[in-house]
Amino acid sequence: MQISKAALLASLAALVYAQPVTLFKRETNADKWRSQSIYQIVTDRFARTDGDTSASCNTEDRLYCGGSFQGIIKKLDYIKDMGFTAIWISPVVENIPDNTAYGYAYHGYWMKNIYKINENFGTADDLKSLAQELHDRDMLLMVDIVTNHYGSDGSGDSIDYSEYTPFNDQKYFHNYCLISNYDDQAQVQSCWEGDSSVALPDLRTEDSDVASVFNSWVKDFVGNYSIDGLRIDSAKHVDQGFFPDFVSASGVYSVGEVFQGDPAYTCPYQNYIPGVSNYPLYYPTTRFFKTTDSSSSELTQMISSVASSCSDPTLLTNFVENHDNERFASMTSDQSLISNAIAFVLLGDGIPVIYYGQEQGLSGKSDPNNREALWLSGYNKESDYYKLIAKANAARNAAVYQDSSYATSQLSVIFSNDHVIATKRGSVVSVFNNLGSSGSSDVTISNTGYSSGEDLVEVLTCSTVSGSSDLQVSIQGGQPQIFVPAKYASDICS
């Protein structure tokens, strides 16, 4: 019997909904994260303690390259000067030490002991110092964590569970079976990620003894290291009922990785975790901005779908690249398309996430090539993308400061044609396009909410225009445009 894609997705969503629903109580910490702009870091690849900017790092080798907590500390001003208010760092706990078929666990996702810090990145005191240095700059720390699995060099049928801490017995894990059908939610949650070369033993998070240990651990982990937020890896592979108590025990905003592009599947996870990675928006965003041949209709429809399907889109995290997906600059070399994609992430709904190296135009494709050593770029503050991000973040930060409702307001599309999208959030009107570097267009945008004669500033060029309900916009060279009331721009374009 043939089953339609729509019916299949509906059944998957039903499985998510079928769990006993415990709505997450959104605490003030989650409210605080709505106004943040996040810079994502793979610790091993961002900055070295010794400050060396020529140390080799061949991504294909998959070795530790020397990035550290102290290295991050030394480059915090590089991040803050782009306007970021928070960082998200890769997992910090001890991982398996083996040189596997896929190299070492420099990325942090192959756990061995949740109570120890990975010494390749520094000491526990170094991590505490990183949190303190961030807080001294009025910035927040988000740490990536794994609750779904541990790691093992080799096949899953020969695991020595006694090497793990604290889950040192097979009884804490699901029986070995590799996921063969990602459309089967029971398999997705109970079978194992990984393969016969590197197994990822899958924890029984539905068991109260496993959940109790994790809840106690996360409370201490967050408290000991002054962590402000958590990113939860592989969330769709974990029993949903595990999350409400776990998130409450942590006491901080958490965002779950639900690697699925259908909002009917992804959005219900907000019943269990306050934030979710916005994969439903990721796919149409990259498809629209990577080529001049795409129409905006898929993207505008998904903006509407996410707004209606997710209980709180302002707590989703938006992105166009990360450590699991190829860098956007590998999809196109057109600088205006890349600039539009970056600006769209920063000025859209939810919480923006920029992956380290986007500001330097790094262009690695999929893992491991999208995990380059940033120090080889020289941390150039004069790169076009660095300056674009700084101005777009400045516009967003000014809007958050000037308008107490900005962070909770939802994006609306106020104009679109095949190649141009104009959005409004609060008093910020942004115009994006996929015309390409040689493209130009004149458009009239209605329903801006601006008053006749109101002074506006386009922050990327610092040009002043006179506002009205109908805004005349001339797109040149395919560049994005961000309009704000003049009072927002006093520090941006002074």
UniProtKB/Swiss-Prot annotation:
The entry's keywords: Calcium, Carbohydrate metabolism, Disulfide bond, Glycoprotein, Glycosidase, Hydrolase, Metal-binding, Secreted, Signal
* CDD domains, per the entry: AmyAc_euk_AmyA
The protein's name: Alpha-amylase
Q: Note the SS bond partners.
A: C57-C65, C177-C191, C267-C310, C462-C493
The residues annotated as site (Transition state stabilizer) are D324
Q: Where does substrate bind?
A: W110, H149, R231, K236, H237, G261, D324, R371
E.C. designation(s): 3.2.1.1
Q: Is the keyword Calcium in the record?
A: yes
- An example of a Pfam family matching this protein is A_amylase_dom_C
Checking InterPro entries in the record gives:
A-amylase-like (IPR013777), A_amylase_C_dom (IPR015340), Alpha_amylase (IPR006046), Glyco_hydro_13_cat_dom (IPR006047), Glyco_hydro_b (IPR013780), Glycoside_hydrolase_SF (IPR017853)
Q: Which family does it belong to?
A: Belongs to the glycosyl hydrolase 13 family.
